[in-house]
Regions:
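Glycine- and acidic-residue-biased ligand/ion/polar-headgroup-sensing regions
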Residues: 70-72, 78-84, 89-111
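A short glycine-rich, His/Asp/Glu-containing loop-to-beta-strand
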Residues: 40-44, 61-84
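Alpha-helical bundle regulatory/interaction domains
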Residues: 2-60, 65, 108-268
Length: 269
């Protein structure tokens, strides 16, 4: 059964960038291919390494509007075709200890997440663990992306390592429910009081865990041996980045365990 295409408002024209908690991170609806895409690449640095096909095609168009929920961020994004990638260097550079949940309103991608093949179409919701590697090739798209701390979601599922690369079919009940919730967060993001943002995100994490539970059971675990090799490579990249940072700041009084934890987004055991 084909997935439904989820209606999407025009982002660049209607985004209330002056409202509290709403920030326009990037906008390039017209312009030279190289200059526009370079701005886009810088806006995503630390989250994804991005590249465009060699032939370039039409001038690059894209936009990101972010809604700040304190410990989480949700964005509305539209852009042209490109490749998204996270390898050990990207992971070490960004230091993100988060999950990324994406609803594709229009367009989609084909890709892989540490050996798990992915195919996302309009209406689908996918999930990435940002401590792990992935690569996707997307056509022109519009999506909603939620950046959620690991500490909110991981305790709610039995095997959080199995979340990476899961796709929730947009034609299913759980897929439709989660898609509607993500769209509601975008629509009401500017109106949510900061004092309510934490409980809202806790409830959102619970909904994500519930909606993906059956998808986890059907998909089964990822290739344990291959995933372990990749995770060891990522760990080594992060440790290398930490060693370089320590060497460069040995004489600084601000070089403390807490400073390292904050910079590299790690927690005490």
């Amino acid at each position: 059964m084909p997935n439904p295409s989820v209606p999407d408002p025009e982002l660049s024209a209607a985004a209330p960038t002056q409202a509290a908690g709403v920030v326009r991170l990037f906008g390039a609806d017209v312009g030279a291919h190289d200059a526009a895409f370079e701005g886009w690449r810088l806006a995503l640095d630390g989250v994804f390494d991005v590249s465009r096909p060699r032939d370039g095609g039409d001038p690059f168009r894209g936009g990101i509007v972010a809604h700040d929920f304190g410990q989480a961020v949700i964005t509305e994004t539209h852009a042209g075709n490109q490749r998204f990638r996270r390898d050990g260097r990207t992971i070490a550079r960004g230091g993100l200890d988060h999950f990324l949940v994406q609803l594709y309103r229009q367009g989609g991608f084909d890709g892989e997440a540490e050996g798990r093949e992915m195919a996302v179409r309009p209406g689908d919701v996918c999930l990435f663990d940002l401590s792990r590697t992935m690569q996707t090739d997307a056509g022109q798209f519009r999506n909603v992306t939620l950046l959620l701390p690991r500490a909110l979601l991981a305790p709610l599922v039995d095997t959080p390592d199995d979340l990476h690369g899961l796709v929730l079919d947009g034609s299913t009940g759980p897929g439709r429910i989660l898609a509607a919730h993500l769209q509601s967060l975008v629509a009401q993001g500017a109106l949510i009081d900061p004092a309510d943002a934490g409980p809202v995100m806790e409830g959102t994490a619970g909904l994500i865990a519930g909606c993906f539970r059956r998808a986890m059971a059907l998909a089964g675990p990822t290739d344990g041996e291959a995933a372990q090799v990749v995770r060891h490579g990522v760990r080594d990249a992060v440790l290398g980045a930490m060693h370089r940072f320590i060497d460069a700041n040995l004489t600084s009084p601000e070089l403390t365990p807490d400073a390292l934890m904050q910079r590299f987004h790690i927690s005490r055991p």
